[in-house]
Design a protein with these regions (language model features):
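C-terminal "capping" alpha-helix adjacent to the active site of nucleotide-linked donor transferases
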Residues: 69, 76-93
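Catalytic binding pocket for nucleotide-activated donors in carbohydrate/polymer assembly enzymes
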Residues: 40-79
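Short acidic alpha-helix that forms the nucleotide-activated donor recognition element
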Residues: 12-24, 39-40
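A short, well-ordered alpha-helix in the C-terminal region of glycosyltransferases
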Residues: 94-108
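Short, small-residue-biased leader/transition segments that mark boundaries at the very start
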Residues: 1-2
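Active-site donor-binding acidic/aromatic loop of nucleotide-activated sugar
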Residues: 6-13, 70
Length: 122
C-alpha cells in the first residue's frame, strides 16, 4: 500500500486486490486484467489505457456501459479527472448501473470456456 487516508487508498503491487475491491466505492485503473477483476466484483471503475492496443479493447468493453472509460492516457486531460471522480461518486444511479452491468458481464468462467475451446480444437 502506497498511501491511505480517510477518503482513499493508493495500492500498488498487490497479488490480490479482491478484498480491497469488495470494500471500495470506486476504482481508478489502467486497462488490463485488474479492470476485469473489478467488473467481476461489481466495482464501478474509471479507466484509462496505457497503450494503443489496450485502447482498442477498452473501447470495445466500454460499449457494455460497465465502466467510465476516459481514453488513451496521452489524450486524457488530467485536470478533468478530479471532476469525473466526484461526479461519478455522487451519482448513485451511475454507480449502481456500472456495478450491475460489470458483474453481469464477467461470470468467472472465462478460463473454463477457453480451455474447452482449446480442447475441442485438439
Amino acid at each position: 500500500m502506497l498511501f491511505r487516508s480517510e477518503r482513499f487508498t493508493i495500492i500498488e503491487n498487490k497479488n490480490n486486490l479482491i478484498p480491497f475491491m469488495q470494500k471500495a466505492t470506486l476504482g481508478i485503473f489502467t486497462f488490463g486484467v485488474t479492470v476485469y477483476e473489478a467488473l467481476y466484483c461489481g466495482l464501478p471503475c474509471i479507466v484509462m489505457s496505457h497503450s494503443k492496443e489496450n485502447d482498442l479493447y477498452a473501447k470495445k468493453l466500454n460499449e457494455y456501459n460497465c465502466m467510465n472509460y476516459l481514453g488513451y492516457y496521452k489524450s486524457v486531460k488530467f485536470t478533468s479527472i478530479q471532476k469525473i471522480v466526484f461526479d461519478t461518486i455522487n451519482n448513485q444511479k451511475l454507480l449502481k448501473d456500472l456495478s450491475n452491468n460489470g458483474s453481469k458481464l464477467i461470470d468467472g468462467k472465462g478460463s473454463y470456456r477457453a480451455s474447452q475451446a482449446i480442447k475441442n480444437i485438439m
